[in-house]
Structure formats: C-alpha cells, structure tokens
C-alpha cells in the first residue's frame, strides 16, 4: 500500500463530506503532517482556501468567517502546539455559537508518548470546549469509505453551534506522486454519491418551537425588553415588536436594535429610571453577552414576576440565575410565534431621561477630541451598506454607553469570552465573508496582541479602516477599583508605541489623526478611494474612563 496516496484519498473523502454540509471556507496553516488535508483542500473546487502563518490568528480568521457567513468554517493545522494555538477561537465559538470544524493533523498512535518530535496528546486537546469531537483512526483501506462519510455526516448533523474537533492521524510518508488510479475502488464503493451534493447519511432532527400558552396574558403586563447579541435582522424586528407592545427596549451595542433608549449604561444610574424599571412585571431578554456595567447590575437585581431569556444557543445564559424560563429558539421565529398586541407605552419617562442623557453626552463631548468623543461619534464614520467590528476592553464599553448605532446595521464583536486576542484576525474573517466596506476599532494592546494579523488585511476585498485607539495601555483597568499604586505597572502596562512602522511593514496605508475633523475626513476618503488604512488615534490615557465616570456621576445626581 502507498501510504501517501491513501492518505490523500482519505483526506479527499473527509473534505468532500464537509462540503456536503455547507462548508465553503477553509483556513489553512503551514505544516507537514497536515499535507494530505492541505493538498486535498487545494484540489477541491467547492472550497475557498484562506491561509495564515499563525494558528492563533488562523482560528480567529475562521471565527470571523463563520460569524458573518453563518456557515460552518473548517480549519486545517498540523500537529503539536500548532493545534493548541486554536484554543482561544474554539472557546469563543463555544460561547457565541459559530460553527468551526477543526481538523488537527496528528502523529499515528505509535509516535505518541515516546519522545517523537512534534507529537503531543491531542485526544480531548480542547477539553469540554468543543461541542463535539471525532477521533479518526489511522487511514487504511480496511476501513470502509462508508464509515468515514457517515461518521462525518453524523457529527455535522449534530453540530448546531460551537466547534467540532476532528483529530486526523497520518503516518509517513506524507509526500510523493499521486497515482490517480490507486484506491479508486475504495472511493467508488460510494457509487453515485460522487455525482450528488447530498450527505451520505442524512440525519433529520426536528425541533418544534414551543409557543408559550400564557403569552396573551403576559403581553398585557408591564414589560421590559433587553436586547443582547442578536443578528441585524433580529435586532430591527425586535425594536418594532417592543415598540408595538409599548415596552421599553434597552439595547446592547451588539443588538443592532437602534438602541431606542440611547446611552442606557449612563441613564441607568439615574434614581428615577431605576425606580420606574422596578415596576416591570416581566422582563424578556433576547440574546446574551450584555456589555454595560449598569445594565448588567440592573439585570442582576431586577425582580419581575417572570424572567424569560430567548436565544438559539442552549444552556444557561443568565449569570444572575433568575427564576423564570430559558427558551431555546431562533429569535425571529419566536417573535413570529408570539405577536405583539399594541399597547400604550407604560414607561414614557424613560424616553425623556434617555433623551436628556444623550443631550448631556453631546454637550460634554462637543469640543473635546479624545477616546470618548470618538466612541460617541462612531455612527458618523460608518460606511454606507457596510459593517462595524468592535474590539473589547474599554472601547466596546464606551461605544455601548455613548453611541447610538443605526437600527439593522451589522455590528460584530467577540463578546463570548471577551478576550483581546485575535480581534484583527476576526475582523479580517468578517470582511472576507461579506466583502463589505468595514470599519474596525480596537485598542492599542489589542492591536499589539494580534499585530501579525495585519498581514491578513492585505487581502481585503473591500475598503477597510482599522482605527487603533492608542491610550497607552489597558485603560479598562482605570474603570475598575485596581490599586492605584500598582495600576500602571501591573494592570495598564503602557507600551509607548506607535503603529506607523507596523502599517509600513505590512504595506498598509497609515494616518495618525490629531483632530476629529482630520479623522472624519480620512475615513470618508477611505470609503471613496478604497484600500486598507490603519488609522491611529493617540489619546490621553485616562480620557475615556474618566469621561464615562464623570457622565455617570452627573446623571446619577440629577434631582428631576
């Protein structure tokens, strides 16, 4: 038997099986042990191949592709620590639901735990974070092709969210001429399957939406709607639905609901707002991953008669552990099955408080160029028919608290584990999936953490602006009660860098904006001229955190 040739046949069948389940994008890192998978992917015309030299970034590239395409995305890496570097992306996918198919090449069993090079224990490498795992045997024609395709089909049919880890051991030799006629009899046992686009094994799973029988009674009550991480279409529908009910909707930065009560993370500090919201008899939360500190505090402390959380991800998504109902359902389908009944708004005072807060924010930031002003004015920078990617740490909190994003405008972020790793890589994946003009915004430490992902931006299919807010360190810790004496050295960790050389190294356009006017003009030019621009905005380190705290204190002190 020619081991290298049969390895290719095995890998070819494996990848072809994945395409029958909607896999179009595959992300590949360089490696020798993964050669059968890589060459088979390159030969499969149904696959779009993406490459990156850093597996950690590669995983997040796949995450972004899956996030924006809403399709399963495959990843190929070689054995050893290459596979371990995918861990952060797998964790994030497990928390936010993107489907990743992780193909880790491995040494055969006789090379494990014996000192062989680049051989680690890859069984259960990612512990409980993948939704599913499939440990394949060493390729051999003694195993029927029908076993391989049906094993993949069964796993993919059950992959409704999160990652599927498929560990793929390959024995040497890995290279050699491919005899196109060898082992065709093994493949041809699948007959006319090769001429179809269907899986070999079609597992049918029916999940029927459960309509809440008492909804007609509850929709007559005083309700509050919390909108967390939902899609753009769902966010727009949710806003219209809540408005029909006459219920206040408090929208997160990732809700894409238009945030009809803007600046919620500021006005929730107002005593009258808190008092009014305590009158809610039912709270409905759609989607998880709420961002704002005061919104999270209110969500934790609220005590309605009923608390329902609706999301298509399974499991508990309520860290406050409310007594109530956890409804696993597509948000759009749930709204259709639970129509609104037009009611008179019961909490109009919140509209007045939110409007007053927004005016206060506008006035406070009108003439002060800095991180807070940039966050508040992000809507003015958005490309028409484009999308926004928001980083983590301080920047997402400022945008959540200060900006009012357009209803139905696509907004992406990694708010599962909320790490600062892989943000630029995820941004690259989001844009490749949609080919839309894209505005991204991250902090300086986030940019440093994923600096080599700037290489991925060189292949952007549409105009892209990456704003790096350089506040010289992790200034999110200025919002937290970290010990002042140790804050700078052990928490914020300022690096005193500028990003012009990084942009030049990867051949990207670079602008350092010194004023709002320069920043806005630069972004506008980028949308018309195209290309990729790294736009650095150097701000006072504590500007964003201090401004947010000042505004919260001002609103909390209002007497009427």
UniProtKB/Swiss-Prot annotation:
Q: Does the keyword Metal-binding apply?
A: yes
Q: Please provide an example of a Pfam family that matches this protein in its UniProt record.
A: TPP_enzyme_C
What span is annotated as the signal peptide, if there is one?
none
Q: Name one GO molecular function term.
A: magnesium ion binding
> Which cofactors does it use?
Mg(2+); Mn(2+); thiamine diphosphate
Enzyme Commission (EC) number: 2.2.1.9
- List the GO biological process terms: menaquinone biosynthetic process
Q: Which InterPro entries match?
A: DHS-like_NAD/FAD-binding_dom, MenaQ_synth_MenD, MenD_middle, THDP-binding, Thiamin_PyroP_enz_TPP-bd_dom, TPP_enzyme_TPP-bd
Known catalytic reactions: isochorismate + 2-oxoglutarate + H(+) = 5-enolpyruvoyl-6-hydroxy-2-succinyl-cyclohex-3-ene-1-carboxylate + CO2
What keyword terms does UniProt attach to this protein?
Magnesium, Manganese, Menaquinone biosynthesis, Metal-binding, Thiamine pyrophosphate, Transferase
Q: Is Metal-binding tagged as a keyword?
A: yes
Task: Write out the pathway annotation from the protein's UniProt entry.
Answer: Quinol/quinone metabolism; 1,4-dihydroxy-2-naphthoate biosynthesis; 1,4-dihydroxy-2-naphthoate from chorismate: step 2/7; Quinol/quinone metabolism; menaquinone biosynthesis
**Function (record text):** Catalyzes the thiamine diphosphate-dependent decarboxylation of 2-oxoglutarate and the subsequent addition of the resulting succinic semialdehyde-thiamine pyrophosphate anion to isochorismate to yield 2-succinyl-5-enolpyruvyl-6-hydroxy-3-cyclohexene-1-carboxylate (SEPHCHC).
Q: How does it assemble?
A: Homodimer.
**Name by which UniProt lists this protein:** 2-succinyl-5-enolpyruvyl-6-hydroxy-3-cyclohexene-1-carboxylate synthase
Q: What is the lineage of its organism?
A: Bacteria, Pseudomonadati, Pseudomonadota, Gammaproteobacteria, Enterobacterales
């Amino acid at each position: 038997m020619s081991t290298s040739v049969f390895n290719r046949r095995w890998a070819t069948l494996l990848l072809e099986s994945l395409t029958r389940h909607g896999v179009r994008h595959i992300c590949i890192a360089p490696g020798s042990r993964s050669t059968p998978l890589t060459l088979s992917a390159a030969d499969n015309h149904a696959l779009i191949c993406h490459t990156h030299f850093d597996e950690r970034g590669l995983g997040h590239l796949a995450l972004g592709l899956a996030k924006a395409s809403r399709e399963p995305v495959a990843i190929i890496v070689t054995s050893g620590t290459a596979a371990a570097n995918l861990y952060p992306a797998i964790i994030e996918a497990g928390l936010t639901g993107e489907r990743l198919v992780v193909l880790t090449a491995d040494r055969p069993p006789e090379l494990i735990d014996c000192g062989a090079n680049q051989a680690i224990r890859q069984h259960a490498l990612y512990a409980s974070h993948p939704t599913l795992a499939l440990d394949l045997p060493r390729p051999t024609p003694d195993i029927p092709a029908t076993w391989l395709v049906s094993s993949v089909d069964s796993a993919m049919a059950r992959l409704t969210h999160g990652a599927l880890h498929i560990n793929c051991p390959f024995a040497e030799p890995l290279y050699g001429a491919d005899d196109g006629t060898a082992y065709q009899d093994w493949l041809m046992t699948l007959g006319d399957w090769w001429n179809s686009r269907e899986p070999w094994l079609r597992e049918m799973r029916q999940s029927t939406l459960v309509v809440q029988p008492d909804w007609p009674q509850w929709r007559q009550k005083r309700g509050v709607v919390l909108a967390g991480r939902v899609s753009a279409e769902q966010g727009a529908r949710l806003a219209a639905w809540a408005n029909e009910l006459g219920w206040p909707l408090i929208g997160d930065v990732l809700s894409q609901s238009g945030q009809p009560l803007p600046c919620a993370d500021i006005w929730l500090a107002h005593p009258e707002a808190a008092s009014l919201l305590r009158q809610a008899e039912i709270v409905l939360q759609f989607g998880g991953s709420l961002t704002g500190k005061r919104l999270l505090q209110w969500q934790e402390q609220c005590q309605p008669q009923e608390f329902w959380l609706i999301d298509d991800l399974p499991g508990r998504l309520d860290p406050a552990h409310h007594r109530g109902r956890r409804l696993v359902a597509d948000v759009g389908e749930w709204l259709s099955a639970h129509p609104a009944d037009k009611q008179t708004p019961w909490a109009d005072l919140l509209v007045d408080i939110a409007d007053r807060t927004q005016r206060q924010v506008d006035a406070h930031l009108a003439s002060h160029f800095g991180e807070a002003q940039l966050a508040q004015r992000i809507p003015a920078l958005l490309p028409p028919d484009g999308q926004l990617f928001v980083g983590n740490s301080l920047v997402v909190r400022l945008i959540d608290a200060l900006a009012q994003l357009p209803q139905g405008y696509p907004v992406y972020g990694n708010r599962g584990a909320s790490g600062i790793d892989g943000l630029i890589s995820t941004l690259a994946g989001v844009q490749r999936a949609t080919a839309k003009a894209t505005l991204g915004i991250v902090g300086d430490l986030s940019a440093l953490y994923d600096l080599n992902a700037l290489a991925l931006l060189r292949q952007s299919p549409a105009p892209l602006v990456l704003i790096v807010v350089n506040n010289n360190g992790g200034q999110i810790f200025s919002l937290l009660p970290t010990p002042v004496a140790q804050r700078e050295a052990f928490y914020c960790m300022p690096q005193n860098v500028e990003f012009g050389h990084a942009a030049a190294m990867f051949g990207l356009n670079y602008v350092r904006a010194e004023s709002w006017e320069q920043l806005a003009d630069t972004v506008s030019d980028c949308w018309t001229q195209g290309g990729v621009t790294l736009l650095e905005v150097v701000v006072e380190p504590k500007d964003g955190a201090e401004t947010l705290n000042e505004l919260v204190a001002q609103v909390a002190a209002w007497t009427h």
